[in-house]
Amino acid sequence: MKEIPKSTKVVVIGGGIAGCSTAYHLAKFGWKDTILLERDQLTSGTTWHAAGLVSQLGPSAAITKIRKYTTDLYKELEKKIDFSAGLKLNGALSIATTKGRWQELQRQATTAQLFDVHVEVLNIDQIKKIYPVINEKNILGGIFMPGDGQADPIGVTNLLAKAAKELGVRIFEKSPVEKILVKNGRVSGVKVNNQIIECEYLVLATGMWSRQIGEELGVSTVSYTHLRAHETDSYLVCRLLLEK
């Protein structure tokens, strides 16, 4: 087993996709003195439950920019690291059945083009050519994103972990954090496997366990908002991942 260092600049707790992505990007921007601690194995928390949808189009320009960057990053790292993230970019189709939603999709398509995201605005005949079995009732139009698709959440996480390691990040599995140390109102380190690791900064990337850890520190974490998809009187959206 690798020896855990006694000090580091940043400790990231959590070996899911959020933790591994954080560690990678910290190192990418120069913060290479970073340690990631995972209590079990990478992706053994909630990450492996994810659907793995890869979508470039967002509800705003900022989200679209981030999603485009993410998709490009996965493709770039797959080539650089020579490790598969399970990317399967067969395209995605979004349709609208109301005028309001149709205008919204057209607006999003315009935003996507500003960030060089390939998007096709389709009428019902064009939609049927892509997805012949679709029920065309009430469909006003749609947009097709050829660069969208799916990825393997475990594969993406391990891809980011490998990329982070190449940049100098040290990752320790089977290393549950027993205690977070606080000095003068600031986090000063963590206790792992009966060993103290001093640090300047701490990142909580522990998903559903973050609230519990935050409460132990007297810190309020961001609450979760659960969304439920359902048909309404205003619009109905159908998003399809297409097989080739």
Language-model segments: residues:
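Dinucleotide-binding Rossmann-like beta1-alpha1 core, especially the glycine-rich loop
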Residues: A51-I130
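N-terminal Rossmann-fold NAD(P) dinucleotide-binding loop
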Residues: G19
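Conserved small/polar residues in nucleotide/adenosyl-binding loops
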Residues: T225-D233, K244
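Helical element adjacent to the flavin cofactor pocket in flavoenzyme catalytic cores
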Residues: G147-I196, E200
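Glycine-rich FAD pyrophosphate-binding loop
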Residues: F29-T46
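Central helical "cap/lid" subdomain
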Residues: I196-R228
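Aromatic pocket-lining residues of Rossmann-like dinucleotide-binding sites
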Residues: L26
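Beta1/beta-strand and adjacent pyrophosphate-binding region of the FAD-binding site
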Residues: P5-G16
